[in-house]
Amino acid sequence: MVDSTHSPEVERGIAALNELLGKEAAALLSPEKTRKDEVACFSFPIPADYTGTPRTLRIAFPRNFPLASLRLNVEPSPWLEWPHAMKSGLCLHGFREKPITGTPETVVHDSFSRFGTILNFVVEGSDRAMRDAEFHREITSYWNTQLGVSPQDLLLLERPKSGSELYATSDPRPSRRNQTAWLATSIESLRVHFRRIAGLSAKIRSPAVPGFYVKLQTFPGVRIPVADRLIDWLTPHLSPDDCKKFLAWFSGHGSLANRWIVLELPGPAGSPVYCLDVRSYSKQPDHGRWYGFRTARRWSGKNQPNHVPVLVRGAIINILDRNDILSRDLSGTAVELEKARVVMIGVGSLGSTIAQQLARSGIGEIVLIDPDMLESANLGRHVLGADDLGKWKAIALAEKITRDLPTVKAIPYVDYAEMLLISKPGLFENADLVIVTTADWSSEVALWRKKSAGTRWGLLQAWSEPHTLVGHTLLAPAGEFDARHLFDDSGNFNFRFTEWPKGDGVIAIPACGQSFIPGGASGMANVASMVVQTALRSLTAQLNEQAWISTIYRPQDAAARGGVYKGPLLEKGVQHIVLEREWPTPEGGDA
């Protein structure tokens, strides 16, 4: 059955297919007409499935086989009857899986191995519970293939604990007015989010209630019903209490053109959600609805008809819930950090990067202290951008963190740390960790003076050496600690790893007493990452003792930039290393 007109790879694939099936089964292969980009095709009868429907497996070798995988299709299509069967054919690979590459024999064997797994779920006499469980693992994919896509996406401002009505307002930004709707269980949540996004207070008096959030107790069927049968399809899978509330909401808001049903899939709290856009009145294309602050006054529900659904679509929904935002971090660190409070002194190029990473790690509250404005020269290595030029760094960064991560409380202060230690001591007394990255000796001295008297908060001082090839962190846990003896009277670290005899370490600028330490964004990222990891270990009680931590990246580059490296030698082939040890001794070496 090998055609010599085929490429050697296809011939090997066909031979592998015959060998895999065996002599008797291979005799059942029937040549079929090829389709676009196919060079060989066969049909093969397969055992009856649980529906009793006779089907045939279509096996096609694509033109660029084995770089392209074998094409397997079942006819007639078992879409919504077999797991992993789509309209276009069988889906042999799961989420983010790719077809393997290899020899023709390997590709044929892999494809049939995966097909055999699917067949085991559906052959006559197969276990229905196992088949249903396989459907449920990818249930939203099957629903998506049956539903159109709503023109409006949704932002759920928090995840409800139980079945709840959802108030709605539209995103006020012009580009999103009819594109995105905000949903929340309370009007106050909508007000807070509006203030966060628009920077204004909103008088949201009577918003529409077009949404309902409900937890599924069991899975509905994989096949979506016609629109007017949707409620019958859904309600058997709700708890009695949720079902009662849901039906009251659905009938009470039947005059709305669009209703949103947010389904939390069965499973533990925080399970994935799926949203249905239920449209009444018309199946005609629409462009999304505007939900204002008093929309509900237009739809009181009194003396208005309850329109049955005529169209059901899937809708994209995102959730601004802390657990959802941090769900990809499975280490458990975020749970421990929820109540952590960090005071960040200095939010320049290093401090801003640290603050942003801490916020994304799950810190509950972060206080940002910095007296400076953002300038154009800062943009190359700061997390803020051109729109923030001329703004106070602390305020602009707090706004960015709050806008990007609404579950984090960011509080800005445009002031000097040494002044706030006197005027607002509670800022520090209530902190778990204070991080200073100012490279300003006066603020560092003030903090170490306070720390030497004993504090409940830990202190982490971090800085980079010129050109960001080297960075350091000194960590002092709760208690009495003082690191002032490790620096000279000007605040220079006595145990630095680089020297800059040509004066290239600190660059003066034409202003009274002002200068900057040179370095790029990539080098600063190395230092920031080291500081963040140290801070997280301290906050989660993994590091409860004083430590000196250094990051070193390509120290040989110092010579090309006018410097001399005198720190620890790196082994051949090592480009980047992080060292951790006790504080250095005053005599000039590690403890």
Residue ranges of predicted features:
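Glycine-rich phosphate-binding loop and adjoining beta1-alpha1-beta2 segment
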Residues: 371-406
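A short, aliphatic-rich alpha-helical micro-motif
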Residues: 337, 427-429
